[in-house]
């Protein structure tokens, strides 16, 4: 960086703490975090960027408490919200790191490992600030405007949070066979590798991809009834992936109707 930019973070929890550490590591001047003892009207003074890392429900209130500046960029880390929630700040923006940050330390490491970021900004100046963050962290970015923000974040929840829920189901079903979840994690990693190498449709394997409905029926007979609703929903979701692949669509046997 030719110019050392400065940032003040409001709400240094896991995400805010991770951003603070990652930005400090790459040479940004990270000012003291903001807590309740700080006059909120002074948060945006003498700083290039104010980064709001509070829960989504508090972002608008925090932004309104900060005195607007003609030079300071005010941004938030929410994936579901766009820059409009930061009105009346002229240089408002949203930057969402598309990674999981269970702790500040782990998050800081992941932010510097070719992380993807979803960006949106109200002005060229605020977009330039966001792009400098991505560039300095060695990341990659794409723009998601206000109207598509919820779609984007729903996909992120499916790709991350829902995977954890799926593995929770796998863990419970595996326990009935006396098998630990750790035995399945290499399978999970191999599946992610297949998706990266081949794309979603061509990465798919297993009984639904083969049209092996007898095996699906054996699964349904074996697993605990409390898991059936999720299992059936996933079978149908898997069928949709198969149906979207022109290579398999013509040869896939139809699923028998339930009697």
Model-derived features: positions:
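NAD(P)+-binding Rossmann beta1-loop-alpha1 motif at the extreme N-terminus of oxidoreductases
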Residues: 1-45
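Hydrophobic anchor at the start of a short beta-strand
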Residues: 7, 30-31, 92, 141, ...
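Rossmann-like NAD(P)(H) cofactor-binding subdomain of soluble oxidoreductases
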Residues: 17-21, 37-107
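Hydrophobic Val/Ile/Leu positions in short beta-strands of Rossmann-like dinucleotide-binding domains
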Residues: 7-9, 52, 119
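NAD(P)-dependent Rossmann-like dehydrogenase/reductase catalytic/cofactor-binding core
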Residues: 182-259
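Phosphate-coordination loops involved in phosphoryl transfer and adenosine-cofactor binding
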Residues: 3-6, 71, 114
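Internal alpha-helical scaffold of NAD(P)-dependent oxidoreductase catalytic cores
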Residues: 26, 107-197
